[in-house]
Amino acid sequence: MAGREKTKSANRVLRISQLDALELNKALEQLVWSQFTQCFHGFKPGLLARFEPEVKACLWLFLWRFTIYSKNATVGQSVLNIQYKNDFSSNSRYQPPSKNQKLWYAVCTIGGRWLEERCYDLFRNRHLASFGKVKQCMNVMVGLLKLGELINFLIFLQKGKFATLTERLLGIHSVFCKPQNIREVGFDYMNRELLWHGFAEFLIFLLPLINIQKFKAKLSSWCIPLTGAASSDSALASSGKECALCGEWPTMPHTIGCEHVFCYYCVKSSFLFDMYFTCPKCGIEVHSVQPLKSGIEMSEVNAL
């Protein structure tokens, strides 16, 4: 007896796995219905509205035929390696649900949802006294059903068996398709993630301490003489037709005491970021940022 109880506890499906299977089933139904409605996208609007409960019931019946009826498991359960077992069977070995249980499962799930949607449409525009009483009785029955589902869910959270009220009434519960072995937990992925997170935090702390602008200026001053393009660039920079930092026509041209010209934004932002900013072309330190004299500026413009 102890060995049998130990085997049952080892093969017991986790609560989260059963709930995940239900969520996967709902996601599949939404996907199937959205894809089906796309087929009627070019038809007259509201074509499926009148027969929507019946169309949905046919689709869910089609899914039931090729999942629970033939494979003893829903799509969500198949993904999680779970299937239904007949709980009324006295045999300790696996016994699939009987044909009657599968048929009643379709009646309770598919037929119940169809009846709820269709009754709502029937009683929506009826104002007779007889229909009012029937509608009130239906509301009471739906309320009792939801109360039963709530109580069943609380029992499921305590015992981990029969995730839905339909499963409890029909005597079917979820079991693993194959016996589950003890899993070996590896920490390689976790260690790698911790190392990468630590390295990223180190870079976030270190990068603000590095003067990127000065490093780029030094690198450009070293690379320009090596490329052999310094003759034309220096001629443009010295003539005042090119910003020594961005390489474009200088906007609000300013100088820093050398022959090169800078955009006001380029030189001011660089100077505010680094008080020891030097010209990337000639290496002269910035003493003061002065606007380019109008006479020189106009002569350069007229020369174009």
Swiss-Prot record:
Top EC category: transferase
Spans within the Cytoplasmic topological domain: 42-47, 125-132, 211-304
Residues at which Zn(2+) 2 binds: 258, 260, 279, 282
Peroxisomal matrix side: 1-14, 74-97, 160-186
Entry-linked SMART domains: RING (SM00184)
Principal cellular location given in the protein's record: membrane
An individual GO BP term: protein destabilization
Reaction catalysed by this enzyme: [E2 ubiquitin-conjugating enzyme]-S-ubiquitinyl-L-cysteine + [acceptor protein]-L-cysteine = [E2 ubiquitin-conjugating enzyme]-L-cysteine + [acceptor protein]-S-ubiquitinyl-L-cysteine; S-ubiquitinyl-[E2 ubiquitin-conjugating enzyme]-L-cysteine + [acceptor protein]-L-lysine = [E2 ubiquitin-conjugating enzyme]-L-cysteine + N(6)-ubiquitinyl-[acceptor protein]-L-lysine
Localization in the cell: Peroxisome membrane
Keywords tagged on the record: Disulfide bond, Membrane, Metal-binding, Peroxisome, Protein transport, Transferase, Transmembrane, Transmembrane helix, Transport, Ubl conjugation pathway, Zinc, Zinc-finger
Coiled-coil zones: none
Post-translational modification: Forms intramolecular and intermolecular disulfide bonds in response to reactive oxygen species (ROS), promoting higher stability.
Residues involved in Zn(2+) 1 binding: 243, 246, 263, 266
Subunit structure: Component of the PEX2-PEX10-PEX12 retrotranslocation channel, composed of PEX2, PEX10 and PEX12.
Family of the protein in this entry: Belongs to the pex2/pex10/pex12 family.
Protein name: Peroxisome biogenesis factor 2
Provenance organism: Cricetulus griseus (Chinese hamster)
